[in-house]
């Protein structure tokens, strides 16, 4: 049965039973705009939208909640306050700000995220950053708006321009987004290599991607693109020693999480000409400091953590948590479970 059908399926006696309570934290006047409230109500849920961001108000509202739709900032304090919650759904891929997973497991709470909603958007943005860096789109556009045209007027607005055909892009991580980046890169006749110790060799072969160790990817690639979640083991995965392995004309791309890259080391590498440039949708501290040296460098493109944005994805990221909560509260397994070990403690079809 499809997830939408499962979510709307209720028993004949549901009306006589106490409706499960679903609390939505942070509706900010918009919850229900894309049908997410209807999804929950069709599943027999009573929906409470909490506009307050005050912790005392949140803790009071969620105490008797059966389900929760929340930002991906799940603290032990919040999870401790849940007396009978069965499911928490968040509208993000990354869950690096969740510190109450073990407690949720103990309490039998399923935590859901949306790992497959933004795949195409982030992959497309990665290629957009690559092309913007290679073609020097931002400084050239600005040069033109200021009255320049090409190299006339005595000012050269750009450095040399790569011809990307036949060059190599190296992917750090080979999950869903990275595989779509590989597919798109191959469309530009780029060679693709990737590092991911958790992915079987067959997945690389099937995608026509050369599997390699991290050091080899860094050494051999003209473009290095980061696609790993932020975990204790990936914090500053790309640091000073890794940047030192890269080619002097290489470009670093990051559409994953800012702290995966040691930002001071990256700034140093760019200032010293150790690498050619960078395309970043994320920074180590967000929002980015207006005085951050990265923002002053013509060989760096920075966008405001918006790689996942599109009209479709924006609506789907709001509907999906509702479907996931509805699925669990009607006894069905959700599509994406962040803490899969909890499934051993709960009974879901």
Residue ranges of predicted features:
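Rossmann-like adenosine-cofactor binding region
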Residues: 63, 80, 193, 197-293
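Short beta->alpha connector loops at strand-helix junctions that form conserved
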Residues: 51, 91-92, 109-120, 196, ...
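An N-terminal-biased, well-structured beta-alpha scaffold segment characteristic
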Residues: 2-7, 11-112, 239, 349
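Rossmann-like dinucleotide-binding domain for NAD(H)/NADP(H)
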Residues: 111-112, 240, 249-349
């Amino acid at each position: 049965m499809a997830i939408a059908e499962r979510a709307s399926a209720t028993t004949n006696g549901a009306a006589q039973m106490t409706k499960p309570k679903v609390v939505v934290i942070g509706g900010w006047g918009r919850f229900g705009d894309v049908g997410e409230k209807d999804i929950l109500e069709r599943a027999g849920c009573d929906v409470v939208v909490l506009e307050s961001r005050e912790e005392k108000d949140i803790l009071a509202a969620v105490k008797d909640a059966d389900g929760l739709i929340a930002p991906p900032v799940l603290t032990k304090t919040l999870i401790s306050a849940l007396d009978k919650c069965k499911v928490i759904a968040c509208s993000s891929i990354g869950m690096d700000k969740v510190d109450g997973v073990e407690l949720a497991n103990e309490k039998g709470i399923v935590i859901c995220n949306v790992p497959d909603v933004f795949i195409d958007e982030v992959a497309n943005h990665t290629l957009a950053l690559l092309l913007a860096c290679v073609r020097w789109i931002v400084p050239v556009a600005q040069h033109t708006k200021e009255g320049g045209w090409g190299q006339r007027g005595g000012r050269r607005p750009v450095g040399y321009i790569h011809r990307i055909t036949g060059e190599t892009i190296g992917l750090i991580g080979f999950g869903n987004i990275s595989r779509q980046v590989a597919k798109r890169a191959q469309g530009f006749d780029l060679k693709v290599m990737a590092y991911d110790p958790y992915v079987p060799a067959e997945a690389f072969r099937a995608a026509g991607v050369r599997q390699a160790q991290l050091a080899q990817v860094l050494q051999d690639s003209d473009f290095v693109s980061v696609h790993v979640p932020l975990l204790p083991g990936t914090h500053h995965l790309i640091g000073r020693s890794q940047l030192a392995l890269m080619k002097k004309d290489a470009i670093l791309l990051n559409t994953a999480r800012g702290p995966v890259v040691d930002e001071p080391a990256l700034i140093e590498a760019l200032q010293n000409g150790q690498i050619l440039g960078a395309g970043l949708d994320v920074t180590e501290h967000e929002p980015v400091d207006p005085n951050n040296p990265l923002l002053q460098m013509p060989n760096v493109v920075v966008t405001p953590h918006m790689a996942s944005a599109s009209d479709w994805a924006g609506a789907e990221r709001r509907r999906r948590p509702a479907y996931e909560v509805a699925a669990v509260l009607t006894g069905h397994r959700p599509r994406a479970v962040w803490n899969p070990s909890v499934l051993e403690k709960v009974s879901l079809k």
